[in-house]
């Protein structure tokens, strides 16, 4: 089976094993939506009376949202748009756009859309753990009102513990995620069947005519309820983002064989319950269960929401690494938490920021209904952006007929924009929070990338071409000392400023000089056979270019060891690494970007992870040479 290819093939057993694993990672978010989605339609920000017509109409909307958005749009079409097996909106943006063309309209618009869509996922990353765990714990107040004052404190404690153990990784307990979610979806289905038996006529909601009549009858108020209906598909983007871990086939198998049937049965069961007793709209999910099963159900729901939250947190870690490697974010400390699974990482700065934001949301809103008012805006926006980007993939990568592309795009955007419009109505009720978070992250991304461009432009203007430098060196050879010097350079062609400064000040050079450039390609992974490009320049100089994918982390000492068969032999004890360290001076004289963004870039640059740690260099073998740069 090809682990990172566009199509995962293999035995039925392997596919089923990956499908089981996908249940524990991919479907946690969408799988826990029954806890609150139906309730919000009839007892939320824009509540509707639970009349039979309204119940059948809303249920029909839920059914067809799952079919059109998740089953058709994502499972059939969007999952085809992989970047060498990897999914997610940043991978999709990288697939569409070689960064060198980003200034060509409409390419620049696509880049900005992709970056904004990725930034919005950070807002979703704070809301999903908050609303999921809180909605699970709220089941306790149904058992007894005595628990009501403790719902928020219990939720906060669980979330704090969840974030505190992130540094340990999920290698040991991750194997349990799949079986727990299988049990969860089984319980969803059984509860749904129990509810359907109360009012079998609820199955009539399969007819989309009920959804149409609901809009005809309710008009504007019917449109408003779409914001609550959308909660059933908020995990749709996760299917695409996690494609690289499992492949298309296992994700599709898990959806059509397990997740979709369980969700439909449970939503039908909740609908049947409301047909039988409209007063149960306050908590239709938990009221499906018999009284004796309430406490076990709360425990299982809590485990399922913790697993869903873990998947979202891990997804934010992965997204951050992609952003760092694509030079959209300052360098941060990335910890590998598993020696076997390269995708299992931990980023402390992101973890603590998520924890603070999530706990603040739980304490501030105090209920999952309050959070539901803020939930969905970011995801709805991202889904619209994904639909637009996939349109260009259909045309430019798949070369589909323009009429077919236009037809599919119209269908997808009609549905997505309807949900987007309904969710925009939530902005005043808290929906501004994920939008503000996304805008802040987007500002960081574009400021960091633009700032690095300005620094590069400044340094290139003062740079000496490498051939000219080598000619001058041959004419006036300096004294050479034993050992190897590795000069890190972010640019391919000129001589590194650190090399020139070192030679000017110290008047000596090592016997071996390696000019090393680490490049990040617009693909998830670069194979070992394509990673290293080594060229002898003469006079003991080597030009070493190393390529990584945006899902990989660079390790320079390992690269140097891998260069030995190519003729570059280095001794770690006599190798010195020379790094440039720019001191940025924001100034209004250089009109690169607004002054406030220059100050923001300078602040981020000062506080980013040192190159020594990012490239895994031995600290006692590193020399840093400073340079002032006006931006």
Swiss-Prot record:
Ranges annotated as spanning the membrane: 16-36, 58-78, 109-129, 145-165, 173-193, 219-239, 255-275, 288-308, 345-365, 370-390, 402-422, 427-447
Could you mention a single GO BP entry for this protein?
A: potassium ion transport
Its annotated compartments are: Cell inner membrane
Q: Which domain of life is it from?
A: Bacteria
One example GO MF annotation? potassium ion transmembrane transporter activity
Reaction catalysis annotation = K(+)(in) + H(+)(in) = K(+)(out) + H(+)(out)
Major subcellular site: membrane
What does this chain do? Answer: Transport of potassium into the cell. Likely operates as a K(+):H(+) symporter.
UniProt similarity note = Belongs to the HAK/KUP transporter (TC 2.A.72) family.
State what protein this is by name: Probable potassium transport system protein Kup 1
State the organism of origin: Geobacter sulfurreducens (strain ATCC 51573 / DSM 12127 / PCA)
The top of its lineage is: Bacteria, Pseudomonadati, Thermodesulfobacteriota, Desulfuromonadia, Geobacterales
């Amino acid at each position: 089976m090809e682990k990172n290819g566009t199509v995962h093939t293999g035995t039925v057993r392997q596919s089923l094993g990956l499908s089981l694993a996908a249940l524990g990672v991919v479907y946690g978010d969408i799988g826990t939506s029954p806890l609150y989605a139906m309730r919000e339609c009839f007892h939320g920000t824009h509540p509707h009376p639970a009349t039979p017509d309204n119940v059948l109409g809303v249920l029909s909307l839920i059914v067809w949202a799952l079919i059109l958005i998740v089953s058709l749009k994502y499972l059939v079409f969007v999952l085809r748009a992989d970047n060498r097996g990897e999914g997610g909106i940043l991978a999709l943006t990288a697939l569409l756009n070689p960064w060198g063309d980003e200034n060509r309209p409409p390419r620049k618009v696509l880049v900005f859309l992709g970056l904004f869509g990725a930034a919005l996922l950070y807002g979703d990353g704070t809301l999903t753990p908050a609303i999921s765990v809180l909605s699970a714990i709220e089941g306790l107040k149904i058992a007894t009102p005595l628990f009501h004052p403790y719902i928020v404190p219990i939720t906060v404690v669980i979330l704090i513990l969840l974030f505190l153990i992130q540094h340990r990784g999920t290698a040991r307990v991750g194997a349990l995620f799949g079986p727990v979610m299988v049990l969860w979806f089984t319980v969803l289905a059984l509860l749904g069947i129990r509810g359907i038996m109360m009012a079998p006529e609820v199955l009539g909601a399969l007819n989309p005519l009920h959804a149409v009549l609901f809009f005809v009858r309710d008009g504007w108020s019917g449109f408003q309820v779409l914001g609550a209906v959308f909660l059933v598909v908020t995990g749709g983007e996760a299917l695409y983002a996690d494609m690289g871990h499992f492949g298309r086939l296992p994700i599709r198998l898990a959806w059509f064989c397990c997740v979709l049937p369980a969700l439909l049965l449970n939503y039908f069961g909740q609908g049947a319950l409301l047909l039988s007793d409209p007063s149960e709209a306050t908590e239709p999910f938990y009221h499906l269960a018999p009284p004796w099963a309430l406490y076990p159900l709360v425990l299982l729901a809590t485990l399922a929401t913790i697993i869903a939250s873990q998947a979202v947190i891990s997804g934010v870690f992965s997204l951050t690494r992609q952003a760092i490697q694509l030079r959209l974010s300052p360098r941060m400390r990335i910890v590998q938490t598993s020696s076997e699974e390269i995708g299992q990482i931990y980023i402390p700065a992101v973890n603590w920021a998520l924890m603070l934001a999530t706990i603040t949301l739980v304490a501030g809103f105090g209920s999952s209904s309050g959070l539901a008012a803020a939930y969905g805006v970011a995801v709805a926006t991202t889904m619209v952006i994904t639909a637009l980007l996939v349109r260009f993939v259909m045309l430019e990568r798949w070369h589909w007929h323009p009429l077919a592309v236009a037809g599919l795009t119209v269908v997808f955007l009609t549905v997505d924009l309807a949900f987007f419009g309904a969710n925009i109505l939530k902005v005043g009720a808290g929906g501004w929070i994920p939008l503000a978070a996304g805008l802040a992250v987007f500002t960081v991304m574009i400021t960091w990338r633009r700032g690095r461009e300005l620094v590069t432009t400044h340094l290139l203007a003062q740079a000496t071409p490498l051939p000219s430098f080598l000619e001058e060196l041959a004419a006036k050879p300096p004294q050479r000392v034993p050992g190897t010097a590795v000069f890190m350079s972010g640019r391919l062609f000129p001589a590194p400023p650190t090399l020139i400064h070192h030679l000017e000040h110290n008047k000596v050079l090592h016997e071996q000089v390696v000019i090393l450039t680490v490049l990040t390609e617009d693909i998830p992974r670069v194979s070992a056979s394509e990673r290293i490009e080594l060229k002898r320049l003469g006079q003991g100089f080597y030009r070493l270019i190393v390529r990584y994918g945006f899902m990989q982390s660079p390790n320079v000492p390992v690269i140097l060891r891998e260069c030995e068969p190519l003729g570059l032999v280095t001794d770690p004890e006599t190798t010195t690494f020379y790094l440039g360290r720019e001191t940025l001076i924001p100034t209004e004289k250089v009109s690169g970007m607004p002054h406030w963004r220059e100050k923001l870039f300078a602040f981020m640059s000062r506080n980013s992870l040192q190159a020594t740690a990012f490239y895994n260099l031995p600290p006692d073998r590193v020399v840093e040479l400073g340079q002032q740069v006006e931006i």
